[in-house]
Amino acid sequence: MSEHDPAAGLQPLDIDALVEARHPDPFSQLGLHHTDAGPVVRALLPNAAHVSVISRADGALLGELEQLRPGLFAGRITSAAPYRLRIDWHGVVQEIEDTYSFGPVLGDEPLGRLAGGDPYAVLECLGARPMEVDGVPGVRFAVWAPNARRVSVVGDFNAWDGRRHPMRLRHQAGVWELFVPRVGPGTRYKYELLSRDGHPLPLKADPCAMQTEKPPGTASIVAHVDEVEQFPWSDHEWIQSRAGKQTARSPISIYEVHAESWLRVAEEGQRGLDWEELAERMIPYVKSMGFTHVEFMPIAEHPFGGSWGYQPLGQFAPSARFGKPEQFARFVDKAHEAGLGVILDWVPAHFPNDAHGLIDFDGTPLYEHADPREGYHQDWNTMIYNLGRNEVSAFLIASGLAWLKRYHVDGLRVDAVASMLYRDYSRAADQWVPNIYGGRENLESIAFLKRLNHEVGYVPGVPGAITIAEESTAWPGVTARVEDGGLGFQFKWNMGWMHDTLHYMEEDPVYRQYHHHNMTFGMVYAYSERFVLPLSHDEVVHGKGSLLGKMPGDRWQKFANLRAYFGFMWTHPGKKLLFMGGEFGQLAEFNHDASPHWHLLDDSNHHGVQMLVRDLNRLYSDEPALYLLDCEPGGFEWLIGDDSGNSVFAYRRTDGAGRELVVVCNMTPVPRLGYRIGMPRGGRWVEVLNTDAGVYGGSNMGNGGLIHTDSQSSHGWPHSAALTLPPLATIVLRAD
């Protein structure tokens, strides 16, 4: 081969590998190279008819390239100045910078941090980021796939042809990167990978994409990153003060929402609202109802709507079902303007096995465990993250931090924590692998959760975010500080309280006396953790019926039972959570294909329940006795906890500074007249709430809004009062 041969410097094996799209290092062959005969440009452009090289500065011709093999062009040029390629696509001429004329974009330092498990390096290095390189606009693509033989980025810009844009491997981190000039936001793309043995894999969506196609499409989309990361936030005051609004001593009442079905548009094929519409409709509603926070079931992109978001693949991308990422940022900003916090359900426990997702990402079990006893969740037919791997742990923590940092979210409710903590969770004896000490505890998950909670406390510029665990076992120290050996969550769902009290309420009042302990047992462990009392979507799905449907009795009794239960819940220690539809006594259980039955509000009973929840939220926020000592023993005292025969409960709530309330619940349909209760202090007490009030749909029985104690001792108190206890009702009294 002569020195003037356009193939000079190319070995036959390299030529074969390039045209067959299996070369592991395309930058070693393509682009500008200096040879003894002068500068040479090589370009891989399948389906091109002719290629020439022109000066980037003035368009002057620098040389013509010869086609060595179909799609592979090479030739000498007169100058090694910055250049562009003039490509004749059989009659359509394109002028563009050569992807392979640009050097590496990612620095060694952040790549080193990525390999070491730094979540901020994930945010810095991976995904698709519009930028300028050497004055040329384009997009830097980067993906972690250490075991792939070759990775190409494919998309609208190259006709989804993996031969066009093979990427550069940065060996120290197993990251493939490529700067593609003249590509911009809005472009669809995926990655084409060859496994270690050269086997082509299904096209993969970008695990770190900030934007995606709307399902059933599965492509990633180059996001307007600056419109998110430089969003003009107006919530500085909220962010700086929110730490004081989300503590154990704060009133927290959460409205749980499935965003897609909250209010469907029947006239437009039952479509869900987008973020702009949700901001316009949902925020004023939630605020008017007195809730302090809205919690969304997972909004990270997920292929299957029937998973309700709990099988996500786009851990960094708000679902395209609701609009663009910057629209979600605008929703959060408007929520904060209205004084509402935003909590997201977040799923680090498992991921679905869709071929375009994380499973066998680079031809190996990269994100999941290789052993199905560790890497497969048989209950959900999903894959379990390998949290013992630095990069996987960093990937997930980066996702959590991204929602907090990029979108100013106020908290993460971490899903399925119990399944993460135990290696034998829902497994037969021979279907799990012990930890290194022979135990059932998942040490890698424990370390992950501790690190997550530590990192959430130190997100630059956005202090005060919280984490909430959905943890259904008695694992100790879920909300204890990491420094004290705990997991470090701020709050934990009290699943035991929920199960026990719902079981009690489902009983016919005749039999409730035999289940009295179900209503009192929660106080035995109420201060072992910082709890949220959850009446979530989980209790109104899969044939369980609605909250109203669980209540026994005729129509009147069902509503009365639900109102009494809400009164008990809102005055019981623990933060509050209620799923959409529950606030007005939805009749049917949750159906993600339909909205809550808002038309029921035309019925006075349903409207009455809604008004009660509104008033309970207001009472809760206005009365420090109901929240200030939620997580401290001094805030609660049983006055009557043992009257199982009458199914009556009475307790005292106090803020420790002189303000106190007395709550009395009658859980039978029998009015109790002259029922004597020992009162913490003598004098007048105002009846500030009665769930049997006529405005709520009740019988309007009560104490006329005011009671006076007398000197007759009762229940260990020197003062007492003879009360009228309405049927199936909760009353709240405040010392006047």
Curated annotation (Swiss-Prot):
Q: Where along the chain is the active site annotated?
A: 415 (nucleophile), 470 (proton donor)
Any keyword Glycosyltransferase? yes
Q: Where does this protein have coiled-coil stretches?
A: none
Q: Which reaction does it catalyse?
A: Transfers a segment of a (1->4)-alpha-D-glucan chain to a primary hydroxy group in a similar glucan chain
GO biological process, alphabetically ordered: glycogen biosynthetic process
**Domain of life, source organism:** Bacteria
One Pfam family assigned to this protein is: GlgB_N
What InterPro entries does the annotation carry?
A-amylase/branching_C, Branching_enzy, GlgB, GlgB_N, GlgB_N_E_set_prok, Glyco_hydro_13_cat_dom, Glyco_hydro_13_N, Glyco_hydro_b
Q: What are the annotated GO cellular component locations?
A: cytosol
Tell me the route in metabolism or biology where this protein functions.
Glycan biosynthesis; glycogen biosynthesis
Please tell me which top-level EC class this enzyme sits in: transferase
**EC number annotated for this UniProt entry:** 2.4.1.18
Self-association state and partner proteins as the record states = Monomer.
**Protein name as annotated:** 1,4-alpha-glucan branching enzyme GlgB
Question: Which species does this protein come from?
Answer: Paraburkholderia xenovorans (strain LB400)
